[in-house]
Design a protein with these regions (language model features):
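A short Gly-Trp-Pro
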Residues: 2-173, 178-241
């Protein structure tokens, strides 16, 4: 059976591997998962995942190995996610069958017919629909919507209700809660000072400026094609860094 070999690497290159995919299996379908597990483990609006054909697994390039990765599993998920222990990039996960992160296959980024953006999974987990509300059509293909297949905990998540719009603070934390802090709205003193330029939303001075980032470094550190950043003055973060 004819195969094509794809090569992946995280940002720091401490994780490198190949996958040999039967050519008859191309294109590999990509789904964007908006469940709270994926968003909070990636620190991104969603994850980008592509299931590998049955029997196809990553072949790590020495000194990379599966044992050198950091794994994470939550009771609400049956899959184990794997991350670079140095730069933090998620390379994929496994639950009998491997699901890989297509964002880190730079060696094949110019190859045609390898990937197909196919579906949004669990967009109802994000309070506002997340990127599913923005990218309903990709490469001329209308994205399918799937809201089944995961536990109620993964669908609802810890943020099933949007934050109170009148709240003066916003809680930020990773999925396991090991990193947790609060972000205060811009103070009146900060808004009035010259140093607020470039930090405050031009539409609402009670909100920090935020943006979508498509740069290579962010993509390879998170394992997602799109990352979001909010620009916050450090003196508005508690506890102090």
């Amino acid at each position: 059976m004819a195969t094509k070999t794809l090569m992946a690497s995280c940002q720091c290159k401490n994780v490198q591997f190949t996958v040999a995919v039967p050519t008859e299996c191309f294109p590999l379908n990509i789904h964007l998962c908006h469940c709270s597990i994926c968003r909070y483990t990636h620190g991104a609006p969603c994850s980008f995942h592509a299931p590998l054909p049955v029997g196809v697994e990553p072949q790590f390039i020495a000194p990379s190995s599966l044992n050198k990765l950091t794994s994470y599993q939550h009771p609400a998920s049956t899959a184990t996610g794997y991350f670079c222990s140095t730069c933090g990039c998620q390379i994929g996960g496994a639950d009998g069958q491997w699901v890989i992160t297509p964002a880190i296959f730079d060696a094949n980024r110019e190859d045609e017919g390898i990937w197909k953006f196919n579906a949004h999974m669990l967009p109802t987990s994000a309070p506002d629909g997340g990127l599913a509300a923005v990218f309903s059509l990709i490469d001329g293909h209308r994205m399918e919507i799937e809201n089944l297949g995961l536990s109620p905990q993964a669908i609802a998540g810890s943020d099933s209700q949007p934050p109170d719009p009148e709240s003066k603070e916003l809680l930020a934390q990773c999925h396991c809660g090991g990193v947790s802090f609060t972000i205060a709205r811009p103070s009146e003193e900060f808004v009035a000072s010259p140093r607020s330029k470039g930090w405050i939303s031009p539409l609402d001075k009670s909100k920090w400026l935020a943006s979508m980032d498509l740069c290579d470094d962010c993509r390879l550190v998170t394992g997602t094609h799109v990352i979001s950043w909010m620009f916050v003055s450090i003196d508005h973060i508690t506890p102090r860094l």
